[in-house]
């Protein structure tokens, strides 16, 4: 348990240093309802108790995901915004005139989330914190310019 606390303390310190160096006031991150985003939320809340914002961004998502994200936010007393990206995604998909591959369509969602996070960050003077983990990097599971 000591080692875990040490890692948490180092991450909190690192986040504070990065935010200060950027002249920012806090952090914003996606809150999906999954384990990775819950860990990010907890660390961000420790680093910035009053300036951490979780964005819940459903897009053809399971209702349980939003419920889990809300439970995480509630347990951490975390400020949240909910931005339903479903209508935006659907409008984009309808407007494309070329055949749509499943992979290309699937990659639109993380890019919409990224755009949303940076919108909030710029308006609030915050930095975006990502939730990628080592195993995702190891296997190459990510979307270029995604969240």
Task: Please tell me what each predicted stretch does.
Residues 1-143:
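ATP-dependent adenylation/nucleotidyltransferase module used to activate substrates
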Residues 146-147:
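Gly/Ser/Thr-rich active-site loops/lids in small-molecule metabolic enzymes
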């Amino acid at each position: 348990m000591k080692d875990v606390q040490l890692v948490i303390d180092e991450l909190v310190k690192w986040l504070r240093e990065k935010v200060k160096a950027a002249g920012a006031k806090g952090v914003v991150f996606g809150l999906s309802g999954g384990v990775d985003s819950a860990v990010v939320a907890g660390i961000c809340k420790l680093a910035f108790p009053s300036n951490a914002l979780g964005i819940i961004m459903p897009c053809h998502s399971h209702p349980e995901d939003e419920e889990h994200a809300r439970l995480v936010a509630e347990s951490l007393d975390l400020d949240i915004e909910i931005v339903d990206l479903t209508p935006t995604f659907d409008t984009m998909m309808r407007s494309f005139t070329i055949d749509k591959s499943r992979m290309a369509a699937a990659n639109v969602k993380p890019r919409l989330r990224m755009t949303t996070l940076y919108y909030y960050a710029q308006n609030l003077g915050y930095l975006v914190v990502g939730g990628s983990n080592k195993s995702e990097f190891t296997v190459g599971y990510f979307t270029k310019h995604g969240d």
